[in-house]
């Protein structure tokens, strides 16, 4: 039995072709922080005939089962990533939407200190930092942050 079949069964989900195909796409390195619409387009590019409504339904099931994590970055649409990754935080460009994952031990320790100060036991947290790509590195607007000539 494949790992994906077992992952679905472990999550209490029936193994179906749409679930397997969507899980396969989510496992591709370039498909982290992917919207339902972009995942649907990727499936179409791969020749898969899975409807957009099915993609949304499966992503919601995966989210409920803990297979994916849903993020609501600025801009209003949800994006998804596999939940099997290590804890990390996110930097998000407000112009192009690029998402950079990072981990920082100092930030993690400071959060624990703040929680202890207020007598709170942390169970989970999410940290999103928003900004704009600098030095012309923005995919959406490469000239937005260059000095005027």
From Swiss-Prot:
Binding sites annotated in the UniProt record for Zn(2+): 33, 81, 90, 93, 96, 101
SUPFAM superfamilies, alphabetized: Winged helix' DNA-binding domain
Region named DNA-binding: 1-84
Gene3D superfamilies, sorted: 3.30.1490.190, Winged helix-like DNA-binding domain superfamily/Winged helix DNA-binding domain
Top-rank taxon, per record: Bacteria
This protein's GO CC annotations: cytosol
Coarse class of the protein's main subcellular location: cytoplasm
Pfam families (alphabetical): FUR
Binding site for Fe cation: 87, 89, 108, 125
PANTHER family on file: FERRIC UPTAKE REGULATION PROTEIN, ZINC UPTAKE REGULATION PROTEIN
Subunit composition and interactions: Homodimer.
Family as reported in the entry's similarity comment: Belongs to the Fur family.
Job of this protein: Fur acts as a repressor, employing Fe(2+) as a cofactor to bind the operator of the iron transport operon.
Name of this protein: Ferric uptake regulation protein
Annotated organism of origin: Vibrio parahaemolyticus serotype O3:K6 (strain RIMD 2210633)
